[in-house]
């Protein structure tokens, strides 16, 4: 919403400066977005060129003698091609700042001739891009006066951002009312007396609508006969131009002026072009109208028009038709002021794609009590600017506004905002805002004015009191302190998410953020595709289902990188997957994909040899690292061979905690999965379920336990066991670890061997065992006894024997 300072002062009696007004507007919730104060133009004066002679030392320059109105001509050197004797232009004197050149003028010599100023072009004053010559004003322009005042450029332009509820401030009078209520002046009474008309309006208005659900709740029409339409006066044109409107003619400009001045949209018809009476009705399917924007619109039965016997003459409340528009030949004019259903206006405007100042106001809700005064204001302006004889104002379908009454306990202000506002202050604020007020010292009975349709309850009145009293008057309060140690801020799941994300990034993986929507084929390939997880209105055909896994998006991202030359890439994501349409079916998952040779130790070729393609063990290591970082008890995790159907059955695994709790899956992808997703290359991946990790036991103290380190040196022992080929290495590791859980602190497989020397169906698994004594150095007898325990444990759990 734009307006000029002088326009605001038509409604507000105030001595406040521009800065004070701007600051107060923001304080009361009418946030100022920009201020265009063209103060730089005030120094430039209108001057007449008395003589123009050729420069003695430059063919393209002229030496001008310029009259500034004080009887003392000024010498100026000028190179403009249109400089001539008699031209009236704009003079900048030494000390004046030229915004288009970003220079301050001074006395100078040009080719040996002194110049005491500069005749300016429009581009040099940033009025337009025109720079082919200096400004050429009308011959009767007042020489010696301020150019800014002459052109109306000395009036600052203020632009505010309105929230949708403040329909009352779509008119400058509403803004002035708020400023007056905030103590920045007095609101002027600018409403004119009713215009006395003679005779009835010959064109009648018929409301063809459902009386129980009307879309037009009032229609005022008046004819002014014998008008003389032409350009609007300079002051009106300057104001309309300042707010971004193009002056057209006096009749049209008046309607635009009243729209911004009062927030009251109007329309004018050329009475000679209207055939018969005006009927407010629904449009008929297939009807068309050529609107004032020179575009033809196709209407349907869900839209509303003002029509005559020729057909639609106006799209109700949005835009008039070209056929009945007013021009310089208009003699008799019909002035229309009506009330329209905001929902109807919004729906029609969206469907036709029309955005107008009238639609902007009607769909937010205009003041119903301004329908008749708006027509009177427009009539008065028409009579002043165009002459003519008005008829009696014809009002159809209007019912007086019924005001809403709200009982408002003043204590609500303190309860909702923390502001201490006295009963008297709250009473006075609401009264200044135009509310009808009465009360008993505790509760105010407030009658909502017609222009505040957004005020519906006590909370709205609290807001009104708060913004006028001053939000900046809320006393600052320190945040509450609950002791030396702050309470926990993040939830367990948030902590797990953060730790898993950091761990995967530290393993050389790059974080990706993929869509939660995937295609139906992708969803079904990863165990999804349930009807309840299909989107009702997908943004694209290949984004129709909520994802059951992170892997489809990560695989697609890896393939896109490979298609662009980045074959070796490792990606991860920590986000949600969806197993159903209830909140408990949304799970927090950390997933990752490695492609090509993107291993933890590096990718591609290096000095020690070519890197091998990624495989199942890379995915396993990533999954276990993420789980450990998230706080899972990895020493108790069981690894079962095989995984979901989208993973390779012989190169995948499932991570479990006990027989029922699944913590994750990992492995290489099934060839059918890669084919279905149209991806290729060496690929492995994993998913771990962060929400499946059991909650840690509550600690008795917030401090970490004391670090206990052994004083004795650790030692390692190697063992090789011959087991059946079907025995997994992990089972051997668990058997060794269980032999003595206090002494054995680490077990690692370092060799697997198969050969004829072991016998058919046999293999050798070699492990390194790390021992850490706690209370004494181990003797040979201790080591021998431990070895027997390890061999016995492996034999019992796997059937393996110590290799000779």
Curated annotation (Swiss-Prot):
Please list the residues that bind Mg(2+).
454, 460, 463-464
* Cofactor(s) this protein requires: Mg(2+)
Q: Which Pfam families match?
A: B3_4, B5, FDX-ACB, tRNA_bind, tRNA_synthFbeta
Domain (FDX-ACB) spans 710-803
Q: Where is the tRNA-binding domain?
A: 38-148
Domain of life, per the record? Answer: Bacteria
State the name under which the record lists this protein.
Answer: Phenylalanine--tRNA ligase beta subunit
Question: Which species is this record about?
Answer: Brucella abortus (strain 2308)
Name the gene.
Answer: pheT
